[in-house]
Regions:
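Second RecA-like catalytic domain
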Residues: 1-219
């Protein structure tokens, strides 16, 4: 097996072990079998299952659907950076990326109830968000809701605007993406095959205040 393939397999096994999806003998655990019920990356499935305990499945399913989309939610708008930042300001949340993404999805859901195709397209254009990503996320969310119903999970369970239940659920699955603020202003990823130093950016974090920790989310 090529060296790169060995690394990929090793990384995948390590992720499953950190999630408690496999035991020390690499056998699938009961939790791992539960993860396998969802057509998701294991870390996202873990977040969905954790959301049941914290009462925020509706929010986690929406966020996971967006994270699973093949298109970025915020397309490159370098030629209109100032306009894009101003338009997206209304969605920003102090807790970071994931709540910001949820705010966008919630706003789009409201638009979908009152606007036709042209109105939805215009809303996305004015707010510099990718409609393709949102439409794909809608389809993924519908599929995930169906899985939840089949396995007896109430996907409508909501935490409203409470931050902690959602963040705790996401942390259950995204442990490898957690980073801590260092004295020099960089962030050190706390898990992974090697220590990584990360620099936050306004576009990435969509936050004005530096947090002592953050969980990265791809846009």
């Amino acid at each position: 097996m090529p060296f790169d393939a060995v690394q990929l397999v090793g990384s995948a096994l390590r992720t499953l072990w950190l999630l408690d999806a496999i035991d020390d003998s690499r056998r699938l655990t009961d939790f791992g079998r539960s993860l396998a019920m969802f057509p998701l990356e294991p870390q996202y499935a873990a977040a969905v299952l954790a959301s049941v305990k914290h009462g925020c499945t509706a929010e986690v399913v929406s966020i996971v659907a967006l994270l699973s989309s093949s298109s970025p939610l915020f397309p490159d708008s370098s030629s209109q950076r100032d306009e894009a930042n101003e338009a997206r300001m209304k969605f920003r949340h102090n807790s970071g990326d994931h709540w910001t993404m949820l705010n966008v999805f919630r706003a789009y859901d409201e638009v979908c109830t009152s606007e036709g195709k042209s109105g939805r397209k215009d809303w996305c254009r004015r707010n510099f968000v990718n409609q393709r990503a949102l439409r794909e996320a809608e389809n993924i969310r519908t599929q995930l809701r169906g899985v939840c119903e089949r396995v007896g999970i109430d996907w409508s369970s909501s935490c409203g605007d409470e931050e902690n239940p959602l963040l705790r659920s996401l942390l259950r699955g995204l442990l490898q993406h957690v980073a801590l603020l260092q004295p020099d202003g960089t962030y050190k990823q706390v898990m992974g095959p090697s220590v990584r130093l990360l620099k936050s950016s306004p576009r990435k974090l969509l936050k004005k205040k530096r947090s002592s920790r953050f969980t990265r989310a791809p846009f």
